[in-house]
Regions:
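Alpha-helical ds-nucleic-acid-binding substructure associated with the helix-hairpin-helix region
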Residues: 19-23, 51-52, 56-129, 181-183
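A general alpha-helix detector
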Residues: 41-46, 78-82, 120-124, 156-160, ...
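Short amphipathic alpha-helical interaction patches enriched in hydrophobic/aromatic residues
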Residues: 46, 79, 83, 107, ...
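A positional/architectural concept
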Residues: 8, 15-68
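Generic, ordered loop/turn and secondary-structure boundary motif
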Residues: 28-33, 40-43, 76, 109-114, ...
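Short acidic alpha-helix initiation/capping motifs at coil-to-helix transition points
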Residues: 1-3, 36-39, 73-75, 114-117, ...
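C-terminal accessory module of base-excision DNA glycosylases/AP lyases that mediates lesion recognition
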Residues: 1-30, 94, 133-240
Length: 240
């Protein structure tokens, strides 16, 4: 499945912002994979923290090959050593095993999370060991399909904003301005900012001072794309 959006969302954003309009028209529609199964999505995002998308995919595929469908019963029964054998750290294996146990015991109600507002869902998800605000926001976007997620904690979003709008830095106040401008379709804006940060428009450059760029690598919370997702774009009139 892909994150669902269409003309309504893009036309709204294009009317709100000339530079984003240019970016949307240049890149075309973006297909971004989603995982509607909240349980497996949480696991996938925990695995992907602070590692490359390639490494995450390798670990994830090993788990799928071993277990088939990931359920709380299967993961809880596997135990930490078995989870580690797929290539993840002890800490991540501990988080994942604990999460599965909490779901089984009813401590974490996934159905309730799906029905919550964005704010309440983020608050609840960050109460789970191993999940911070950035991870919770990515789960809302790429599992629950929430339409208005723009993450200040994602350094690639900040990079995309710098590149598109020629800023040297993105302060919280400046970020809130863009968050308000793109609402209620911040998630769609995120897709295009990630694409810009990943080099979809070659002539765009990062305006951050060189010392800042050298000090920040593109990893979790700073990814060119969220590590658990595959994104491709298609345009009726591609430009080079």
């Amino acid at each position: 499945m892909f994150f669902r959006y269409g003309t309504k969302e893009t036309e709204y954003l294009k009317a709100r912002d000339a530079r984003l309009k240019s970016l949307i028209e240049r890149i075309g529609h973006i297909d971004s994979e989603t995982d509607p199964d909240l349980f497996s999505s949480v696991i996938r995002h925990i695995i992907g923290q602070q590692i490359s998308s390639k490494a995450q995919k390798t670990i994830w595929n090993r788990m799928l090959d071993a277990f088939g469908v990931l359920t709380p019963d299967v993961i809880a029964a596997a135990g930490i050593p078995r989870l580690q054998s797929f290539g993840m750290t002890f800490r991540k294996a501990d988080y994942i095993a604990g999460f599965a146990s909490d779901v089984l015991r009813g401590k974490v109600d996934l159905g309730a999370i799906e029905r919550m507002t964005d704010e309440d869902a983020i608050r609840t998800l960050t109460g789970i060991r191993g999940i911070g605000t950035w991870t919770a926001e990515m789960i809302l976007l790429f599992s629950l399909g929430r339409p208005d997620i723009l993450s200040f904690g994602d350094l690639a979003i900040q990079r995309g904003l710098r590149m598109v709008y020629h800023h040297k830095a993105i302060t919280p106040a400046l970020f809130r301005k863009y968050q308000h401008r793109f609402s209620p379709y911040g998630s769609v804006a995120s897709l295009y900012l990630w694409a810009a940060a990943a080099g979809a428009v070659p002539e765009l450059r990062d305006y951050a001072p060189l010392s800042v760029k050298k000090g920040k690598s593109l990893k979790q919370g700073a990814t060119a794309l969220p590590t658990s997702q595959s994104v491709s774009s298609r345009s009726a009139n591609p430009r080079t």
